Amino acid sequence: TFYEGKVPGFLHLYVGEEAVASGVCLNLNKDDYVISTHRGHGHFIAKGSDIKKIAAEIMGKETGLCHGRGGSMHMIDIDNGLYGSTGIVGGGFPPAVGLALAAKKNNSNQVSVCFCGDGSINEGSFHEAINLAAIWDLPLIIVCENNLYAQSAPQEYHQKVKDISERAKGYGVRGITVGGMDIFEVYSATKDAVDRARRGEGPTLVECKTYLFSGHYVGDSKAY
């Protein structure tokens, strides 16, 4: 379909990372908040969004989640707690913190989950977000889908630490690393993080080490 020219723009597939979205979203209620990424199709499916509307949106059709105007990278489905995916690297952290703050102020027992990639951890928005979440003990779970490459750059090119979860320590935040290819590991780690958040014990950074079976996007030469 993509190569037939039926999908406008870029297409970032989630093939290989399904255990992360599934393991995380199995712990969430319908009204819990999720902020997604440019590679968000799996998050939307796992959170309960209509797969036909997702497909329609990817193809730019009026019957899509955003009436075909958002496309593959910019979808939203508030009825299912999905407050947007974004093509901006690190762009999901600020709204995820805002949603977590709203949940705390409203005593709603909701949690806010922010999916992100390994490359986005170097963005200033990550550090600002996790710092505020720690100071205010917000019900925020940052799920870092570490597929070992920030587009074409391997992790050792842009981060000294072996486990990204270690970076949470500098903010007094609990960090944990799990095998992102194992749905049971992801589920267990996320359950603990969600339970802590609902008890008012603050944020958690969950790093899921996974691997992307395709290139960064459809048509990627994968020269790296």
Task: Identify the residue ranges that each predicted region occupies.
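Ligand/cofactor pocket segment of small-molecule handling proteins
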Residues: 135-138, 145-203
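Cofactor-binding active-site loop characterized by glycine-rich and histidine/acidic residues
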Residues: 6-136, 154-160, 165, 170-172
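Short acidic (Asp/Glu) and glycine-rich catalytic loops that position anionic groups and cofactors
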Residues: 2, 31-36, 145-146, 167-174, ...
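Structured core elements
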Residues: 12, 35, 141-143, 177, ...
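Flexible, glycine/charged-enriched surface loops at secondary-structure junctions
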Residues: 1, 112, 201-205
